Amino acid sequence: MKSVGINGYGTIGKRVADAVSAQDDMKIVGVTKRSPDFEARMAVENGYDLYISVPERESSFEEAGIKVTGTADELLEKLDIVVDCTPEGIGAKNKEGTYEKMGLKAIFQGGEKHDQIGLSFNSFSNYNDVIGKDYARVVSCNTTGLCRTLNPINDLCGIKKVRAVMVRRGADPGQVKKGPINAIVPNPPTVPSHHGPDVQTVMYDLNITTMALLVPTTLMHQHNLMVELESSVSVDDIKEKLNETPRVLLLKAGEGLTSTAGFMEYAKDLGRSRNDLFEIGVWEESLNIVDGELYYMQAIHQESDVVPENVDAIRAMLEMENDPSKSIQKTNKAMGIL
């Protein structure tokens, strides 16, 4: 049983904590928070030992009636690996300032830059390259979504080139300081966007160009893909391959799943904690091949799709499982992923 800690119990951190707790080969030793907010209180109520990353704030936690087990440094000393879910840019500083000095393995999130971490990870793309490594970055929610569907397509028939238009949510549901509220924003306004190069950190030789927008919604990201194929296949071949791919779901618009809102309603009906959708949803009706080019649309739940990848990264880096398919299967079974 490997000892895991979560540095940053926020949107991703709390989900990774629950995912790790669901496994039978790893356990959560503790989680960290900076402020005595509702998430800190919920962490304790959910049975996690809480460690504070700013020791000087211990009195504010005491005043709020939130039990503190110790400091973040004390937590890190107890771990085999830490999953860093701190805000963008903080993880890289933690790597250099703390983890490397302690000799502690660490997993980072997609907000960190690939060059600062040195290695990126996706369960379906480069699991074997991360086995036994000390530091790795789980690629972003958008990149994870692209890799989930492009990998099986590449395995089936090869890919010459990918062009993707990313329609990104403006903010997470709980965020009130981001937007837009009443605009469509090219983000970035330059082409290509950073998503293509991010995919190439795990699918090394893929020819991909991306462009991205921000829109006033909070539910999900939506991708529109155009994929030039190397070999001739039918739409039915693509459907069959995606159907058998873990963490990918074919959505039927004809059954009422006509939007990201419908997809999230489906998550509620599944009884998922926090309405999470770890799977990437591909609209079956959007699948089409014209002159050797595959077209399809997909939806990504930005708050949760990277969570199972964090669990797989733990197994790879701690050399708990050398077969990616076995880790994926084990993670999925424990988390109830379709």
From Swiss-Prot:
BP term (GO), one: glycolytic process
Binding-site residues, D-glyceraldehyde 3-phosphate: 140-142, 195-196
Cell location: Cytoplasm
GO cellular component, one term: cytoplasm
Catalytic activity: D-glyceraldehyde 3-phosphate + phosphate + NADP(+) = (2R)-3-phospho-glyceroyl phosphate + NADPH + H(+); D-glyceraldehyde 3-phosphate + phosphate + NAD(+) = (2R)-3-phospho-glyceroyl phosphate + NADH + H(+)
Active site: 141
Entry annotated with the keyword Cytoplasm: yes
Pathway(s): Carbohydrate degradation; glycolysis; pyruvate from D-glyceraldehyde 3-phosphate: step 1/5
Keyword Cell membrane: no
List of residues binding NAD(+): 11-12, 111, 169, 302
Family: Belongs to the glyceraldehyde-3-phosphate dehydrogenase family.
Assembly description: Homotetramer.
UniProt-recorded name of the protein: Glyceraldehyde-3-phosphate dehydrogenase
Native organism: Methanobacterium bryantii
Name of encoding gene: gap
